[in-house]
Amino acid sequence: MRLKTLAGVKTMCIDEERFEQAKNRIIGVSRERQGIGTLSEKTTHAVLKNYYAPDPAVHEIPVADFVADICDGKEIIEIQTRSFQAMRRKLAAFLPEYPVTIVYPIPRQKWLYWIDEETGETSAGRKSPKKGNPYQAFIELYKIRQFLGDPNLHFRFALLDMEEYRLLNGWSRDRKKGSERFDRIPTAFVEEVCIDCREDYMQFVPYEIPENFTAKEFAKCAKIPVRLAQTTLLLLTEQKIVERIGKEGRSYLYRVCEILS
């Protein structure tokens, strides 16, 4: 997926060969024969860690009172597959000392598999109708909004195709609702969206947005839910990418700020 924006999408070239090597190192080429039960519970985290830093000597390095996923003495890379709220204390310790890049995987296309804990059987895969996009990261960015202005903080949103394995242990009759996620297996690295400075947030403003717009109009142009658009606009306002200029009925009215180079 490409974000069509005013400033253009800032992406990095995906090294497909290195990604396959990272997958094979963690998953193993014979995982289909061995079965899902042999896999690590944090496969996506491990694959991305090996993609961004193939040298294991820089993995799991003590820094301050914490352990960094990757640290080569010059910078830190953190692979964050869950809530960014857990990153607050780490960021407070890391950012004064090192540039920190947070890698956040987003499922672009997902295939769902169900595991019966009693029999060990795994269902056939079903393609999820939902597709992920980079705007989803703003839900997590909101949780560390106090750090977003730090020039040492960078982001890589990794859009991945993946298989998701869930345990049939939920509360509903079919045991799917409220079920536990067992593992996510990345199958393809589709795109990487980068944020390295304040101006990079401009790429999240849709190209076709009107000069003055509401959150509902932003949501329509970005093809995201209104609630997600509201969160995105809150952070874009704080980063001085957009500004509130009044109201239209009960809705806030926004416009894009002029970005000075």
Which residues does each PLM region occupy?
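Acidic-basic catalytic patches of nuclease active cores, encompassing PD-(D/E)XK
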Residues: 2-67
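Short acidic, hydrophobic short linear motifs in intrinsically disordered regions
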Residues: 209-221
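A short, conserved structural fragment
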Residues: 237-247
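Short amphipathic alpha-helical interaction segments
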Residues: 224-237
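Short, cationic-aromatic polyanion-contact patches
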Residues: 247-261
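A basic- and aromatic-enriched beta-loop-alpha substructure that forms the phosphate/nucleotide-
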Residues: 89-151
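Long, low-complexity, charged/polar intrinsically disordered regions in eukaryotic proteins
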Residues: 124-196
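Conserved catalytic cores of phosphodiester-cleaving nucleases, focusing on short active-site segments
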Residues: 48, 68-83, 87, 94, ...
